[in-house]
Curated annotation (Swiss-Prot):
Protein's name in the database: Large ribosomal subunit protein uL16c
Recorded GO CC terms: chloroplast; mitochondrial large ribosomal subunit
Homology family: Belongs to the universal ribosomal protein uL16 family.
Keyword Ribonucleoprotein: yes
SUPFAM superfamilies the UniProt entry points to: Ribosomal protein L16p/L10e
Subunit structure comment from the entry: Part of the 50S ribosomal subunit.
Molecular-function GO terms, alphabetical: rRNA binding; structural constituent of ribosome
Superkingdom field: Eukaryota
GO biological process, one term: mitochondrial translation
Ribonucleoprotein found in the keyword field: yes
Amino acid sequence: MLSPKRTRFRKQHRGRLKGISSRGNRICFGRYALQTLEPAWITSRQIEAGRRAMSRNVRRGGKIWVRIFPDKPVTVRPAETRMGSGKGSPEYWVAVVKPGKILYEMGGVPENIARKAISIAASKMPIKTQFIISE
């Protein structure tokens, strides 16, 4: 699972997801990509599940690039705990994505294989996405 080696602070505010992605919204490495259409938090487990599904489908032929990294800690309080006594402890890591952000890129495979692999990865994501091809 992906997570930062070290961070400056253990806990973060939740923040809000407004606007569209101004960075990481163009294909840079591969020929095909999976692009988000909604704002969301994507957990490191979901990122890994999508990556595994794609690499299993492509086998040795192509190359896959993961363009997002989970750098935001999400805290969870223990079950049946009374209110107060501080914020919960960090439980898992998420990547904050806005509409337009590229999640995965792929190259070195025919379009039909890429489309199939990326659609399987898209089904693992908690949001609407689209398949795009670089010109």
